[in-house]
Every structure is written in structure tokens, then in C-alpha cells.
Amino acid sequence: MSAEIICVGTELLLGDIVNTNVQFLAKELANLGIPHYYQTVVGDNPTRLREVITIASKRASILLFTGGLGPTPDDLTTETIAQCFHSPLVEKAEIIEDIQDKFKARGRQMNENNRKQALIPKGATILPNPTGTAPGIIWEPIPNVTIMTFPGVPSEMKRMWSETAVPHLKSQGWGKEVIFSRMLRFRGIGESSLATKVNRFFNLTNPTVAPYASLGEVRLRISAKTASETEANAIIEPVAQEIIKIAGEDYFGQDDDTLGKVVGELLRQKQQTVSVAESCTGGGLGAMFTEIAGSSDYFWGGVIAYDNCVKMSLLEVSAEALDHHGAVSDIVAQQMALGIKKRLETDWGMSITGIAGPGGGTDIKPVGLVYIGIADPDGNVESVECTFGDRSRDIIRYLSSCTALDQLRRKLI
């Protein structure tokens, strides 16, 4: 028994719309403990849609459709499903009445085209749409195959799913065992290196452990299928603790933890403060601190020192350092960190200076070269050289800010 998600709409194939529906439904199926192995996107073409339905109905027992329920000629989902299973369409008076009421509430009259939305396969149950004019259906056209259809509008689909579809699935016995997951997050280690360290955990069956790589970090998802969250935690916790111990300082948090949140908590625990001096990141590092509510407890402010004159006047970077080493150098990064620490009288001072591109690089100092400076409460200062490569400007700036936060985190733990 498994589910398959079928998203209908040429706009999805063309990339005009981001398919958030499939992400939502995939997570919901996992939460209900319903396995699903296939996701299909098909355009508004009845021939190709029939092919998809024919294949899906042979390999899945729950078919979830989104899109193609509107009143226009290219909205063909319902009638194509009916054709596949040789069922006539019947007009439902209660659907027409509901659509008319919704138009009336908006001071409008229902268009005759909307009558199309009242046609459903004979024997199907209406899946009500509380907000829109496109209802869905719940239908078992053949034994062991249940079809559910939803409009493509995400807000409408989500409400129909939670209010009607989920209770129906639970009444059929689904959801007795659900999947609970915990995401462990790591910085400063590559996916392959982490996978090598924790390779033995990938053979587990309950819980399962799977790696995910994302920009600036690696994640491990630990998932358990149980009847309750308490049981899941009892299974997940020992595995999580073993992995955290193996990863050491490269582990920084779990689930919704961000570097900014984790570093902020460490500063708060130590009752210490921090300030930042930024060049190429243009405030990105400060933004990561201040996106956390209550960050004024430990983050006192920063200076965006883009021009060398600002570096000298506000951060006391020496003209000699700029002349002899250049703005992008370890010496300047160190002086910037000390300068902001002194000016704002914080325990920690941080700095970032680099070449974010796309221009400005040389053979000696290429695009992606970044220096991060950190001055500690005792007045000691260090700098780290980073080479992010010739990547996009946004990525270099983002990785620079993340790396700076991670460097401070490692000094605080």
C-alpha cells in the first residue's frame, strides 16, 4: 500500500510556478506513515494525463491529484480520471449551490463555465472546498485504489487536506503508526566526510538515518516509525547522541536551530556581547544575529566598512596595513575585529573582508577569497582565510557570514 502524487498543470512544467503542493503532501504522507515512491508532474493534456493515471493506478493504492479542477477548457483532471475508469460524470446540485453562494457573497453572479466544476464521476464523494469554487473528490473507482483530487491553489488544497482528506485516511486505518524525524545539523565538514564517520548508522531500519547536503551545512535526518512521539524519541535519542559524539565540534544544532540562534544562546549563557565590522557581506552577518528575537541582549551593533576611509576612521585600520597588504588580508581583518570591539566596547569583535565578485579578483587574490577576524574578550585576535571559489556573489556573501558565525561558535563552546 503506497501513495502517489500527481500534479497537473502546464505552468508547473514550464517552471512558471514553484510546486509547493508536492512538498506539502509528501511531508503529510510521511507524517501519516503512508509510504510514497513516485511523484509526477504532467501538463494539461488529456492523453498524457491518462497515461499517468493508468501507470499510477497499477503501482499505488492512493492517488493524490492537484490542479486542473478549474472552470476553463484546459482544466481536465476530473473528466480525464472519469474517462480512465469508464465512469459517467454527474452534475451535483449541492456543488452548484455552493459556487453560487460564494459568487453572491462577493457581489457577483456565477459564470456558466463554473457549472463544469459541479461534474464529478458517478459514485464519487465530494471533497468540499470551504474557500474556493473547485471542490475535489474522494473516489474508489476500482478495488484497492482511492483517488483524491485537490485544486492547485495551495491554501485551498491544504485546508481540504487537513479538514477532510486526513480524517478520511485515518478512518481507513492510516496514521496508526506515523513517522517522527529529527534533523541534526553540522558545519565545517563535507557530506562525504560525515557519511564516512557515521556510515554504520545508514544500515538501520527503525530509526533510519539519511544525509542531506544544503548550502553551508550538512544534515542528517533520523526518522522513526512508531505509534507515538514518545516512542519515537526513545528510539531516536540514543542514535542522535552517538552521532553527535562522533561529529564533535562539527555538530551545531538540530531541527530549526540556526547558527545565529545557537551562537546567540551561547553568548547569552556566558553573558557576553559581540559587535561586527563587515565589508564584502554588507550587513549579512549582523542580519544573522538580529533575525533572532531578543538578540539585543548580546549583539550591540556593527559597522559596514566598505570604503577604506571608513575602515581607517571608524575601525582604526592602519594606512600601512591597507597599503602593504590590501583591504582583503588577514592583517586588515584582525584590525577591523579589534577596532569594532574597541569602538562598541563588546566582549567579542568580528570582521569580514573579501572579494565577493563577480569582478575584482586577481591571480593572487581571486574572487571568493575572504578573511574573517575574531577578537576575543582578552584582546587576542585571530583571522581565518577562506576560499569559496568563483561562485555567485550572493553565495560567497552568505557562506562568509555563516563561516564567521561558526568560527565564533567554536570559540564559545
UniProtKB/Swiss-Prot annotation:
Region forming the signal peptide: none
InterPro entries hit by this protein: CinA, CinA-like_C, CinA_C, CinA_KH, Competence-induced_CinA, MoaB/Mog-like_dom_sf, MoaB/Mog_dom
SMART domains per the UniProt record, alphabetical: MoCF_biosynth
TM segment ranges: none
Superkingdom: Bacteria
Family, per entry: Belongs to the CinA family.
PANTHER family named among the record's database cross-references: NICOTINAMIDE-NUCLEOTIDE AMIDOHYDROLASE PNCC, NMN AMIDOHYDROLASE-LIKE PROTEIN YFAY
Protein's recorded name: CinA-like protein
Species in which this protein is naturally found: Crocosphaera subtropica (strain ATCC 51142 / BH68) (Cyanothece sp. (strain ATCC 51142))
